[in-house]
Amino acid sequence: MISLPSGTRIWLVAGVTDMRKSFNGLGEQVQHVLNDNPFSGHLFIFRGRRGDTVKILWADADGLCLFTKRLEEGQFIWPAVRDGKVSITRSQLAMLLDKLDWRQPKTSRLNVLTML
């Protein structure tokens, strides 16, 4: 996983994104659709129409970075909102990339120990 500075926000870009877009196209979408700055250091996560691919755009001290993950089967869990952006935590990002439902994580039930 990438080490992110404190204060870095992680944004899911709602809706469907054309996965043919790269640095310029995704950066333009961040600027004009989300009214945000792609060089802010925040992560912007886009999902394609089929739901099996996400792209993460972020800027570090040296320039723009683009990470792509495509699932061999299944889809990434995505918010139901159609436009705008949704903020998630680092833990939710890890769950998203592991194809887990990050929206309502469930804890495993702890075994109750009894003293005899």
Each language-model region and where it sits:
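Polybasic/polar functional segments that serve as interface/processing modules
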Residues: 1-116
